[in-house]
A protein has these predicted regions:
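Extended terminal accessory/targeting regions
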Residues: 1-177
Length: 177
């Protein structure tokens, strides 16, 4: 299962958008999805501030095009489109951390699509304290590890400077008859 054929064949429309010039097919567990030629995409919709972490295209380009297509056409629900996206990222060999970051971002986008301001505020009231709650232990543990590393490095330097090297063994004395 996975994508059928080679990579996507696209033409640039402008600085952000591209158009498929050949169909892109994905064989799922039960269904086959085909993105038609002429479909307009921006590849991975990554905010500009995060492009250094996740570029707009890469090993996940076909998965991003498929996800754009499934969300725009409504062929499957948003949750299913996000699940297919995650599965296709796995099949494309995208690393686990990047795969989960990308999946979490599209899930968040799907959940916030059409959300009322009250819903977004409720989500922020949970998310912001959670980040702060997690940031404090991360900073403390990182600082402790840095102190430990510095102490260990100090002992290593002292040991390296004061080490004693044994005298080289004597050369063998060869006698011939």
């Amino acid at each position: 299962m996975g994508f059928i054929g080679g990579g996507p064949v696209v033409e640039e429309l402008d600085a952000k958008f591209w158009r498929l010039t050949e169909p892109l097919s994905y064989q799922g567990a039960v269904e086959t999805f085909t993105v038609p030629a002429g479909f307009r995409t921006d590849f991975a919709s990554v905010p500009r501030a995060l492009v250094w972490l996740i570029p707009r295209y890469g090993a996940y380009t076909r998965a991003a095009i498929l996800h754009d297509y499934l969300c725009r056409t409504g062929e499957v629900g948003f949750a299913d489109a996000d699940g297919i996206f995650r599965r296709s990222l796995h099949e494309a060999g995208v690393s686990v951390p990047r795969r989960w970051m990308m999946w979490a971002a599209v899930r968040l986008g799907s959940r916030l699509r059409g959300a009322r301001a009250v819903d977004v505020l409720g989500w922020l009231l949970i998310a912001v304290p959670s980040v702060v709650f997690l940031a404090v232990p991360v900073v403390v543990v990182t600082a402790a590890l840095l102190v430990f590393w510095m102490v260990e490095l100090g002992f290593w330097v002292v040991g390296w400077i004061t080490r004693r090297t044994a005298a080289p063994p004597p050369s063998p004395q060869m006698k011939t008859a």
